[in-house]
Amino acid sequence: MSSLTIGLTGANGFVGSHIAESCLKEEFQLTCLLRKTSDTTFIRDLIYTRVTGDINDENALSRFVRNQNIIIHNAGLTKAKNESEYMEVNANGTKNILNAILQFNPKIRRFILISSQAAVGPTSSSEPLDESIPKRPITAYGRSKARAEEICQEYSNKIPITIIRPPAIFGPREKDIYEYFRIINKGIQPVIGQENTFSVVSIQNLVKGILISIHKQNKNLECYFITDEGDYTWDQFSSMIADQLNKKPIKIKIPNWIVIIMVGINEVYSKIFKKAVLLNKEKLKEMKQTRWVVTSQKATKELGYRPVLTTKQAIAITVDWYKENGWL
């Protein structure tokens, strides 16, 4: 068994469960910070040490960070009722963990933050975004992730920190892009707004990038985009999904006014029932952008990152998992 000890937040979710599995395959000793109410279905068969609490619980954090060589901070909100909720969890939660590290494990080898392309915003030119581009987030979620990165910068003279920025992530267990798989499986390909181009990363490639970053000996702060090779339009991405599903979906153009009405209904629902929704004004801002394209050249050069799967291969694996688990 490896002597490397890993502390992981958000281990029960889509991304976190895959990180947890891969850490155990590497024979790392894994400790997971989980809320008392966390649904642990995805990690129920894994062997790990559980610390019960959350990223606002100082006592739990003190127990969680002790004796860890690496902390991978993956927990966070991707949907929230308002910006303050995003900030409280995504930004302040990051600060809480870093404070706990300074107090209880100041000689930690590395803190790895799983951030997002949303922290930087869409592409403003024909060239893909790289790590030198200034952050221009356009959503509350993006601003909260950008703030988390800024907090990391503030602590980087005391703690070695790596920031991983994925674009849109897909793969087994993912529940948002999954809805697109589900609709295409019904023979429909919705076309919303103008055509846009974007980067994606399969969960397998993302986890590969995270694992190799564990051994990167940067002294201060490094940031890396991790992505699949190439970029796609929604039509191209949809075609790959349809091919794996053996479907020839009918393309249905959804007028902007219908989308705006749907967003309005969702916003009212969210306010009345105090629940976060996926399709809201923030998501509409993202959908209106024409390019969400990044490059992982820095990760390739400095980390030796190479995708382990093509996007097409990863879509095939994802479709198989959705079918095997009754999602399709």
Indicate residue ranges for each PLM-predicted region.
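N-terminal Rossmann NAD(P)H-binding glycine-rich loop of SDR-like oxidoreductase domains
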Residues: 4-26
